[in-house]
Amino acid sequence: MSIEFTVPLRRRWTRALGIAAMGLAAMVMAGCASHYIDGATKEVNASMFKKPAAPAPVQVLFEFETKGVSNTRATDALKKQVVEQVRASGLFSATDEKPAASGALLGIKLNNVPMSDDAFSKGFATGLTFGLAGSQVSDGYICTVNYVAPGKKPVVKVVRHAIHTTMGAAATPGNSTKAKDINEAVNTMVRQIVGNALNDLSHDPAFN
């Protein structure tokens, strides 16, 4: 899935996400910003997942939050991408937003938070690029995957990621990859953070 951004759409997307850093919102809407995907969270392909011997159907519920508050517009913008990624994972026999015959439920929550928040920084002591300076701001993202199968305890996995944005002559953020635009940055971040969470889930003995 790809979400295309003309300048007006970029403005609407920024408002929809409720970007945690107001400086980032201003940069994006100005149309002259550079966006970088943090390199601490790597790409994980579905081929690396540990596939269950007998995959079961699952209901997928996705929600995007901005600083812990439900963001309906951003949820709607990203839901298809996330559900399709789960469907292509090979971890389940069938994937739907409606209740599954097995009763299994996979909840995926993606929370956009300032990287200075305790909820973000305490869970990521190393890896992400801090020490921001000049016209550079960063948004943190926390992906929480919660898998619940009938008669079993929930299996929860949490992964963190970030998008860095610079404007003008600001130095390139270290350990990051430049995206061509905010569209590519957001879609790549979502794909990577969800992929890592699904990979962690697949290797948990409680899931398999």
Residue ranges with predicted function:
Residues 2-21:
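Bacterial N-terminal signal peptides that target proteins for export
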Residues 109-154:
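Surface-exposed short loop/turn segments
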Residues 52-55, 98-108, 144-156:
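A short, structured loop/turn motif at beta-sheet edges
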Residues 19-22, 106-118, 165-167:
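Compositionally biased, charge-rich terminal segments
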Residues 32-91, 202-208:
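A structural "domain/chain start" motif
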Residues 27-31:
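C-terminal motif of bacterial Sec signal peptides marking the signal peptidase cleavage site
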Residues 57-62, 98-116, 190:
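A short, hydrophobic beta-strand-centered structural micro-motif
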Residues 40-44, 138-142, 154-208:
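C-terminal/domain-edge helix-coil "capping" segments
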